[in-house]
Amino acid sequence: MPIRRNPATPTPGIPFARPFAWLVAWLVAWLVAALAFSAPAIAQRPEALWYARGEASITSFLAHADKVTAISPQTFTLDRNGTIKGGIDPRIVATARAKGVKLIPLVMNPGFDQPSIHRVLTDAGARARALVSLGRMCTDHKLDGIQFDIENVHVRDKDAFTAFARDAAAVVHKAGCTLSAAVVPRTGEDRGPTAYHQWIWDNWRGAYDYKALAESLDFLSYMTYAQHTGNTPAGPVAGFPWVEACLKYLLSLGVPPAKISLGLAAYSDWWFPAWDEKAGPRMRGHDISWTRGMEILGKAHVTPAWDDAQKATFAAWDEKGVFQYVWLEDARAFTAKLDLVRAYGLRGYSVWKLGDEDPKTWEIIK
């Protein structure tokens, strides 16, 4: 029951009321400032970059362009002589211009051929030609930016690739475009315990000096997918613990969150027994769309389950005595990884690729 006081009786402690109010206000202001300093800045609408390859990608882009910030068609190649070839489907160009979507096509070493990119990085003539070609590509196609999709670079070319990216950024920026790079992720500097781990380190993961690249480039698309592939046993395309471990490592190097676009998978994977004359009998992993994954499960009369640890949907079933496996990157899995973008205050996300996604994915993108 509240204490009733005589209005004429002075309230005890009134001489201290004003200083106490000042102290409370000061503490509140300090706490707000501390939280603002320590917490990551969360973008209201993270930049949504989607990759495109093939007709299904174009169809999806035309239907969902209003939820795409940047479109990156994989349609340009950089050959061993430093020559860039390719173009962009006019439907992509027209829709991007009409909807205000940035055009940031990929430039890749064709087939991710290692000897070709080694020559570009180490031969003076090919290197110079590549730099000129990048500047012309930017102006000739009236692009907003260019993104390197240069993969299967041997670790011995790490410094050469870093220097090439730095010089390319100067050329491309002068031409009025941004330059970014899609980079293969890793969780640390350890080559790993097995020959497989060491092979993937030497040829795929180890060649990226993330911090130096981030200093030269506008941002990095950090490809946290392909955790399991056709070269590995069945497993999630991008298991949540692995994705977050890769991201934490990148941040630990001092790469600013504002320069990180988290790579998200829209595709799924299917492992099944196969045989051909070259390879003989083997277990094969194959990238598939979400729609194809659901068709496979429907044909097998299998209901997938949710793996809460990996934040992914999966199924395994007996097909005449031999197991098959599907790991789906559905809308629920996509949401779990998208939450990392917000939690760590990242620039945005980069999705491989349009046309592979669960249609419900678009419902969760604001």
Where are each of the predicted segments found?
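Short, acidic/polar
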Residues: 52-65, 124-139, 202-211, 329-340
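A cross-domain feature marking catalytic cores of carbohydrate-active enzymes
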Residues: 52, 75, 105-109, 150-152, ...
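Acidic/aromatic/glycine-rich contiguous surface patches that form carbohydrate-binding/processing clefts
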Residues: 333-366
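Glycan-recognition patch characteristic of GH18 chitinases/ENGases
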Residues: 44-133
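Conserved, mostly hydrophobic/aromatic
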Residues: 71, 148, 220, 262, ...
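Bacterial N-terminal signal peptides
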Residues: 22-38
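Glycan-binding loop/region signatures in secreted carbohydrate-active enzymes
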Residues: 266-340, 361
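Substrate-binding surface in catalytic domains of secreted glycosidases
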Residues: 80-83, 154-297
